[in-house]
Amino acid sequence: MFDQLDIVEERYEQLNELLSDPDVVSDSNKLREYSKEQSDLQKTVDVYRQYKQNKEDIDEIVEMLSETSDKEEVDMLKADMNELKDTLPGLEEELKMLLIPKDPNDDKNVVVEIRAAAGGDEAAIFAGDLYRMYTRFSEGLGYKTGVIEMNDSDHGGFKEISFTINGQGAYSKLKYENGAHRVQRVPETESGGRIHTSTATVAVLPEAEDVEVDIKDADLKIETYRSSGAGGQHVNTTDSAVRITHLPTGIIATSSEKSQIQNREKALKVLKARVYDMKLQEEQEKYDSERKSAVGTGDRSERIRTYNYPQNRVTDHRIGLTIQKLDQIVEGKLDEIIDALTMSEQTEKLKELNNVDL
C-alpha cells in the first residue's frame, strides 16, 4: 500500500510543477485536465502526509525517551506517543479507502429515464412518485433538474419520463438507482382494499463528453414532428418536437418542449448519453463475467428495491437493507440508502484490493 502512496505523492508533486509550466497554463484543456487530476489526489496526499508526520513524531518521542529519566517528562512523552499511535489505525483505513479506484463518471451530470412497467395505471402513478422522489433528493443537494421528454398517463403519473440532474457528483449519488423498482400498496380506486404490486424501471446515464463519444453528423437522422399531450391534444402549434436516430446503433432520443433549438440540443445530449451508456454496459458485462458484484449499477432488469406502503417499509434487495421510513424516503430522503450502497461497494472493492496484496 505504501509503495502506491509514494507513487501518488510523486505524481502530485509532478502536477504541481506542470501547473506552473507556462505551456500548460496557456493550454486550457491541459490546465483543466491537470487541475482535476491534482484535485482528485489532494485528499490522499494530505492524509498520507499526516500519517507520515505522526510516524515521524512517534520516532522523535522514542528518541527523546531514551535521553531522559525525568518521570514527569517521561509520563508526558508517553501520553503524547500513545495519542499519536491511536491515530495510525484510523489513518491507515482511510488511506485504504482513498486508494480504491474512483469511478471516472462519478462527478458527471446524469440523464435519468423512468418507465412504467407492470401494473398499468398504478405503475404510471408510481413512475411519477419516483420522479418526484429524485427531484426532491436533487434539490436537497443543490442540483438542478430539467425535463427532457415526458409521456403523461391519463390517470396521473407518467408512462415514461426522462430528465437531467446537473451537479457535482450527481452520477455518484444516483448510479445505484439503475434497475426495477417495485411498489406494494392499495390503489385509491381499489374499493376492496387489496394490495396491488406494480413496477417501474429506472435508468441512470452519465452525460457523455464529446471526447468520449464520437458521433458524426452523417450518422444522425433528425426529424421534427408535432408534440401531443395527454389524450392526444396538440400542445404546440408548430412541429417543434425533435427525434434523433443514431443510424449505426439504432438508438433514438426525442425531446418535445416548446423550442425546437432546445429540443435538438436536449435530444442530442440524451443520444450521446445512451450511446456512451451502451459502451459502458458492454464493459460492465465483460467485468461481470469475471466478478459478480453484489451492488450492481448495470442490469436494468434486476429488481433492486421494494416500496411497501402499508408497512412504511423500503427494502433494497442487493444488500438486504430494510428501512421503516418509506414516508421520508419518497420525499427525497435517500441518503441512508445511498450511503449504505456506497459503503457496500467500497467494501467489496477493498476486499479485491486486499486480495492482490495492496
From Swiss-Prot:
PROSITE patterns: RF_PROK_I. Pfam families: PCRF, RF-1. It comes from the Bacteria. The keyword Cytoplasm applies. GO terms for cellular component: cytoplasm. One of its GO terms (molecular function) is translation release factor activity, codon specific. Signal peptide: none annotated. It is found in: Cytoplasm. Gene3D superfamilies: 3.30.160.20, 3.30.70.1660, 6.10.140.1950. InterPro entries: PCRF (IPR005139), Pep_chain_release_fac_I (IPR000352), Pep_chain_release_fac_I_sf (IPR045853), Prokaryotic/Mito_RF (IPR050057), RF-1 (IPR004373). Methylated by PrmC. Methylation increases the termination efficiency of RF1. SMART domains: PCRF (SM00937). Disulfide bonds: none annotated. The modification N5-methylglutamine is found at Q233. Keywords: Cytoplasm, Methylation, Protein biosynthesis. Transmembrane segments: none annotated. Belongs to the prokaryotic/mitochondrial release factor family. Peptide chain release factor 1 directs the termination of translation in response to the peptide chain termination codons UAG and UAA. This is Peptide chain release factor 1. It comes from Staphylococcus carnosus (strain TM300). The gene is prfA.
